[in-house]
């Protein structure tokens, strides 16, 4: 696959291709670092190109309490994805329970976006989900640990 300026790549770092010359490819990282890769390294190793296909899936994982109605949480997520103007209607976003974890139910939301809208949607969804979960009484739990205390035999003997 060929590279073009503005493609977004990931190897050890993620960045946008700014320039390609005979000897190296220049990437700019998201925290504004210029990274120069020798072209031999880019062509001889696996590289993920996030932009060449035009659209990208945003995988958002949310945890809810076991005491929360999971259907309500999924409805809230659907209303958020339906309302966001940058989320594509096709492929249709998927919202699924992906794990029954120790302290929470994990729900994953899979909306599709244009590649250039990925980070905008990512941050928008996190903010909207926090607001809507709070508004709808959907609890995002803390990790929980049950502790059981046992009295030792010596303690029991001194009380006799």
Question: Model regions: which residues?
Answer:
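Single conserved hydrophobic/aromatic residue that forms the stacking wall/gate
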Residues: 1-5, 9
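Envelope-exposed proteins and targeting segments
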Residues: 13, 23, 33, 56-60, ...
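A generic structural motif
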Residues: 21, 31, 41-43, 51, ...
